[in-house]
């Protein structure tokens, strides 16, 4: 299975999400899955299987400064790389984050798994409710790295259908497996 991992944060700037994305990519590659990480990089990419999407711009988000790549050239690189790689599935980390993650959800070049890391519902999510719900509806499967992140992933702002979140995730995972077996 060809797997793409999209990280919104520059991989050359240390951070928890970046470390998790790179660790997941290594584990998937060790299991024999061709895996590429698509992310901003300020300098040379950390591994040969990383597709750099350009430099990051320090961006205020959730009370801190995040190294994101919201510029048009990064979005175009992402679209081109996703098309060229022909992934079977793409795991988008922080799927509602500005820049390459939102672009991945809009373009949806393959089934999407959204991994939520952030906790709490931001004012932007509330004020952009219809857009946030539409973007979340593009995800085929949602997962969270913590209980707090799970609350965000399952909040009414993000829920695009009325269902118990675990039943929804279980059905989504089963469907992804069935689609992959075809």
Which residues does each PLM region occupy?
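Alpha-helix capping/helix-boundary segments
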Residues: 43, 96-97, 104, 148-151
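Histidine-centered beta-alpha loop that forms part of the nucleotide-sugar donor binding/catalytic region
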Residues: 8, 93-94, 116-120, 165-167
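A short, active-site helix/loop in glycosyltransferases that binds the activated sugar's phosphate group
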Residues: 123-125, 136-162, 169-173
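Short N-terminal targeting/anchoring amphipathic segment
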Residues: 78-99, 113
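N-terminal strand-loop element at the rim of the active site
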Residues: 7-14, 21-72, 80-81
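A short, histidine- and acid-enriched strand-loop-helix "catalytic/donor-clamping" loop
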Residues: 96-99, 111-127, 141
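Conserved catalytic-core segment of nucleotide-activated headgroup transferases in glycan assembly
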Residues: 170, 174-182
């Amino acid at each position: 299975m060809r797997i793409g991992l999209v990280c919104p944060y520059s991989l050359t700037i240390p951070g928890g999400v970046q470390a998790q994305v790179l660790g997941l990519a290594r584990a998937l590659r060790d299991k024999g899955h061709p895996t590429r990480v698509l992310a901003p990089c300020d300098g040379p990419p950390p591994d040969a299987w990383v597709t750099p999407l350009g430099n990051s711009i320090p961006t205020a988000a959730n009370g801190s400064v995040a190294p994101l790549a919201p510029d048009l050239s990064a979005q175009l690189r992402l679209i081109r790389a996703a098309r060229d790689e022909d992934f079977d599935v793409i795991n988008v980390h922080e799927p509602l984050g500005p820049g390459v993650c939102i672009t991945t959800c809009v373009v949806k070049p393959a089934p999407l798994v959204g991994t939520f890391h952030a906790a709490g519902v931001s004012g932007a999510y509330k004020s952009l409710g219809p857009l946030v719900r539409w973007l979340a509806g593009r995800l085929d499967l949602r997962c969270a790295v913590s209980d707090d992140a799970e609350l965000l992933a399952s909040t009414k702002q993000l829920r695009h259908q009325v269902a118990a979140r675990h039943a929804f995730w279980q059905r989504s995972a089963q469907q992804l497996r069935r689609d992959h077996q075809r």
